[in-house]
Amino acid sequence: MAAPPKAWKAEYAKSGRSSCKSCRSPIGKDQLRLGKMVQATQFDGLMPMWNHASCILSKKNQIKSVDDVEGIDTLRWDDQEKIRNYVGSAPATASSAAAISDKCTIEVAKSARTSCRRCGEKIKKGTVRVSSKLEGQGWYHASCFLEMSPAATVENFSGWEILSHEDKRAVLDLVKKDAPSSGQTSSKGSKRKNNQNDIHDCKAPKIIRSISEGTAEDKGKAVVSHDSNANSSDLQEKLKEQSDTLWKLKDELKKHVSTAELRNMLEANGQDTSGPERHLLDRCADGMLFGALGTCPVCSSFLYYHGGQYHCSGYVSEWSKCTYSTTEPVRSKKKWKIPDEMDNGYLTKWFKSQKAKKPERVLPPMSPEKSLCQSTQQNRSFLSEGLDKLRVSIVGQSKDVVDGWKQKLKDAGANFNATVTKDSSCLVLCSELESENAEVKKARRLKIPILREGYLGECIRKNRVLPFDLYKVEAALESSKGGTMTVKVKGRSAVHESSGLQDTGHILEDGKSIYNTTLNMSDLTRGVNSYYILQVIEEDNGSDCYVFRKWGRVGNEKIGGTKLEEMSKIHAIQEFRRLFLEKTGNPWEAWEQKTNFQKQPGKFYPLDIDYGVRQGPKRKDIDKMKSSLPPQLLELMNMLFNIETYRAAMLEFKINMSEMPLGKLSKENIQKGFEALTEIQNLLGNTNNQELAVRESLIVAASNRFFTLIPSIHPHIIQDEDDLMVKVKMLEALQDIEIASKLVGFDSDNDESLDDKYKKLRCAITPLPHDCEDYKLVEKYLLNTHAPTHKEWSLELEEVFSLDRDGEFSKYSRYKNNLHNKMLLWHGSRLTNYVGILSQGLRIAPPEAPVTGYMFGKGLYFADLVSKSAQYCYVDRKNPVGLMLLSEVALGDMYELKKATSMDKPPRGKHSTKGLGKTVPLESEFAKWRDDVVVPCGKPVPASIKTSELMYNEYIVYNTSQVKMQYLLKVRFHHKR
């Protein structure tokens, strides 16, 4: 991952066009300026608010630390000193070491539940550990902490006085080990040279390396001693001399060498020739003084100097930038080349005076604070263990309960907030939800998830932050200001409402071409999450055309802009194609014809959006039309086709709603999302055969790909299986939303009655009388089989509908007649999935989907205890009514297992899989339905099998034809807390 952006940027003005935000006067070209970095409103990114350096440095408390200033080490030395003097501390001084020491805690570990945030290993009970308030309440091994911050004064740490004498001595031994004196060889590093003032002989101090270089033990780590003022002064003198030499060379090059000659010289030495003159000067000066840089070992792209390190400028794939960085770049040992054809007296004279052996570049040392933060960030990036980022607020019945969790969270390295704040990760309830509770109200207002108490226990047990979705008491309302985009479909597409032409125009169609596209780009390494909408709109009653553009950041209406240009049809098409090529790097025909389209690095990717084509004449006053459906069925149709239900589901999954028409992501786009998740699953499982740096870059690239294909408000690196499974469930829900959208439409002009929509399901749905035998059997089955551990809610049966989906019985009849062991079993699912289920039947996860999260492989899962399946309805207090299925399942001979086992299908001779639970329905209370179908409606009792890892039975079939949906139940959940 790229380092987070800094608060300030320092540079010499590239032109005289900028104005100072403080004094309002122009900033002259090449004048030192300081820019405060702010979120841009017209594009997805940060922009500097420029000021004269003198205007900023004349005010108090503007810049807090030199580490907050990007580009400070590339300024002329005198200008660097101005900023350092303003801040009041030079890098790596005793004062900064004292500052970091004041922010640390040291103690003996009270348990073995915490993990070191640097190495990821468990911190054993009874061993000394250190916490830095700079990084929250996470813990480190004392040795790991002192390796990252050798300048820290442990005697100033909070808790030092209460350590035992033996522990103090052990820690002080580590301090001595990690801080070698000047002129001595460190136990983990190389020997520092003394009394070498010539820049050509100075040795570059090594600092914390990128994770891409491996661990410190791979090559050794030279530690810059901060205990010696002489050493620090010597280093500063070398840095000053180096800076003066670099700037003298750049000034001479700018005076005597043209831009074309700079490019030719860089090309002759195998260096990057792109960019403006200032970048060419930087690269030439670096290469001429220290030798030509080698290429990135990960992706073979060019390296460039920035912020005390050399970074890769390339892309590890078409989806992601390369994250490689190093302080020890490979350089050519040959002399810097001057092309033979170049006739430049200055360069010829310089070449003759060039020394054969180049010195190493002296790199500025990190301040202890920056060293700690960066090392922690790098080493933690793919160690998902640890709870240091979790900030929890708790509402409990008693102070003792809250205090108990508070201590457990502290021991685990998590953070406890006494009250809900905007920085809180979640609010956890240790009691029944009280809507009038002040903290609950605040959480709702701040859109912070409200979770069950069990979430904390699971996080502590697994020692990582788990996804919130499975533990939500109620879904946080996370709609963006604009809500869902209004869609009016005309022809085969829809005009964007922001154009103002929805009522008077339509998307231009020219043969098979539909001039409308939505582009997306998510790049986690750059913090980019952008969309770009491009349309050609033709007037309904004329031939005039408009090119409409809208761009911004996904989920943030305050960032971005629009543009509407009127032009002729021919010019509008040309402009559309030009912009598409500019934004994607591909011609329009490649996407339109689905041939040879290649995602280009740093470019947008088109989303495959299916608006569908409405057929049939419009009808007015749909709501006033009489329905022929029974009242119970009419109410069910209202539930199934309520657009707000689908909108809430997409918001829960943090799908972008302001620019994504509801349900319009195509089936192909969702399949590509599954493919990206499968790639991530394979990378997460491949821990032995790949370098960590390469694996990290590939996971970032696959995450970029996923969030580009599936626009999300909060993209992030998908780096553990829990998060991966949440994304799989999200895509499964999107599949059903896509089916519902295609079947009945969600656009604002949809004019179908509920009777019409019911017919489109192609599934006969008949309400059962409450006094019939089948209804009573289903009710008994529901009331009897509530599992003892599912205490959060009870279930009330409201309606039962018999089902007969077109064609399902004919497929099932073969198995019904040939397989024994048929049972009536439960299946639960989200309300938004049922249009897809009723119209297409229960479906097995597609081949593109990862296998993560399926205990017994990809199949259809059923239960014999109602509450086991009811968990998957995902209802809440606000919407307490869900739907459940009772299906007749032909199980045949079952492959019985006591623990999760990955498989594609059961062994030969077996027709299904049964996971054996420790609690089962009482067999003596089973009933028979329609002669040969078993209804396991007995009360839950302990099973004879005690060693199983499963709490309750699970039944899995791997062929959809073994299932016949029989009943749809409308069930009300009564939440107890």
Swiss-Prot record:
It comes from Oryza sativa subsp. japonica. Zn(2+) 2 binds at C116, C119, H141, C144. The lineage of its organism: Eukaryota, Viridiplantae, Streptophyta, Embryophyta, Tracheophyta. PROSITE patterns: BRCT, PADR1, PARP_ALPHA_HD, PARP_CATALYTIC, SAP, WGR, ZF_PARP_2. GO terms for biological process: DNA ADP-ribosylation; double-strand break repair; protein poly-ADP-ribosylation; response to abscisic acid; response to oxidative stress. The gene is PARP1. This is Poly [ADP-ribose] polymerase 1. Residues 504-604 form the WGR domain. It comes from the Eukaryota. It is found in: Nucleus. Zn(2+) 1 binds at C20, C23, H52, C55. Residues 626-745 form the PARP alpha-helical domain. Residues 752-977 form the PARP catalytic domain. Residues 291-335 are annotated as: Zinc ribbon. Residues 254-288 form the SAP domain. It catalyses: NAD(+) + (ADP-D-ribosyl)n-acceptor = nicotinamide + (ADP-D-ribosyl)n+1-acceptor + H(+); L-aspartyl-[protein] + NAD(+) = 4-O-(ADP-D-ribosyl)-L-aspartyl-[protein] + nicotinamide; L-glutamyl-[protein] + NAD(+) = 5-O-(ADP-D-ribosyl)-L-glutamyl-[protein] + nicotinamide. Residues 177-199, 218-237 are annotated as: Disordered. Involved in the base excision repair (BER) pathway, by catalyzing the poly(ADP-ribosyl)ation of a limited number of acceptor proteins involved in chromatin architecture and in DNA metabolism. This modification follows DNA damages and appears as an obligatory step in a detection/signaling pathway leading to the reparation of DNA strand breaks. Keywords: ADP-ribosylation, DNA-binding, Glycosyltransferase, Metal-binding, NAD, Nucleotidyltransferase, Nucleus, Repeat, Transferase, Zinc, Zinc-finger.
